């Protein structure tokens, strides 16, 4: 395998030996029978085979067992009552036996050398508790961009502070199972951004995160996926940060960073809610638009858009409908044309700054 660059903070003494790790690939499954085949197949076709592949059925009504029939004895199928994605991942991690739990979403795929590359990184840097990789983002069957392409970068120098601003960790991670379980796994009370909250908790506890600077997975942007629900995701970010703010391990300076982040995501949410109100003809549409247009710290793009919504709501609604007809928004605020790739929605990013 070709040498790949590992992005990570400076090494520290961990007391661990750099021995080859074992991996348990876990997949949370809820109503994914038609699409889960490719994900499972990609986990089983790794050049470094995982110790096990665990699929946790989170109370699906579809025939997941039939979808997994081609894999039979090569996959462990867990069943539980519906409790959400975080609950399913926690159950799978608790049942796993590998040194690392490797998260794979049901609609994504690993490239064949991904686990091998992660294993090499673990041997080279036994102090790392979480390792991710770059990935290709796909929409409408075409590659949109790399995950880490300059617009979104992996933080090396000050992971603790930067995680309080944004989640820079691509979510298909390998995380030490013992560390993950010791710190409580994913918080099942948080929706949409539970992975970010978990990485914050681990880093505040001293964990370090590494990233292999090569696209070793395919992350599919889907209009109907959980990642497309922007208002709920933004609320989840605020909930994550509000929980983090109460953490006694934060310094006063770090708590100020959290406060600034909460304010930024609140501005982002305000713009999203103003848009929805304009689109639905809500009675509070003009008030919401004026609040964005005149509010402190909003960027100029958000102000201009909100001013148009306040002064010409019908025109603004027509423009928003046309944009929704032409494109949709996936993970990371990436706006994708319905038949081709597109650029991120800059006004949302502008609202947050």
What are these regions (language model features)?
Residues 2-235:
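Nucleotide-sugar donor-binding/catalytic module of glycosyltransferases
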Residues 4-15, 209, 221-353:
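C-terminal subregions of glycosyltransferases and related glycan-biosynthesis enzymes
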């Amino acid at each position: 395998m070709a040498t790949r660059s590992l992005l990570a903070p400076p090494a520290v003494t961990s007391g661990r030996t750099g021995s080859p790790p074992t991996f348990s690939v876990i997949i949370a499954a809820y109503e994914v029978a038609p699409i889960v085949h490719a994900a499972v197949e990609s986990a089983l076709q790794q050049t470094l085979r995982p110790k096990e592949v665990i699929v946790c059925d989170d109370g699906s009504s579809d025939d997941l067992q039939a979808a997994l029939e081609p894999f039979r004895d090569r996959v462990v199928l867990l069943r539980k009552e519906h409790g959400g994605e975080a609950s399913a991942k926690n159950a799978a991690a608790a049942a796993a036996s590998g040194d690392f739990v490797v998260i794979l979403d049901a609609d994504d795929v690993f490239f064949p050398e991904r686990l091998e590359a992660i294993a090499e990184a673990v041997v080279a840097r036994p102090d790392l508790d979480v390792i991710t990789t770059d990935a290709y983002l796909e929409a409408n069957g075409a590659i949109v961009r790399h995950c880490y392409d300059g617009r979104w970068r992996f933080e090396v120098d000050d992971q603790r502070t930067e995680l309080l601003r944004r989640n820079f960790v691509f979510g298909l991670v390998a995380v030490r199972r013992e560390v993950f379980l010791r710190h409580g796994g994913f918080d099942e009370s948080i929706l949409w951004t539970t992975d970010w909250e978990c990485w914050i908790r681990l880093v505040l506890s001293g964990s370090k995160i590494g990233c292999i600077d090569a696209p070793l997975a395919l992350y599919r942007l889907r209009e109907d996926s959980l990642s497309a629900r922007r208002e709920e995701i933004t609320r989840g970010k605020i909930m994550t940060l509000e929980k983090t703010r109460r953490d006694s391990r934060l310094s006063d300076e770090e708590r100020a960073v959290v406060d600034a982040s909460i304010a930024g995501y609140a501005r982002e949410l305000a713009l999203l809610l103003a848009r929805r109100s304009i689109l639905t003809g809500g009675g509070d549409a003009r008030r919401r638009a004026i609040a964005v247009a005149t509010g402190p710290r909003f960027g100029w793009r958000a102000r201009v858009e909100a001013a148009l919504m306040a002064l010409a709501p019908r025109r603004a609604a027509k423009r928003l409908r046309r944009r929704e007809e032409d494109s949709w928004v996936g993970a990371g605020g990436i706006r994708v044309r319905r038949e081709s790739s597109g650029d991120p929605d800059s006004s949302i990013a502008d609202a947050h700054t």
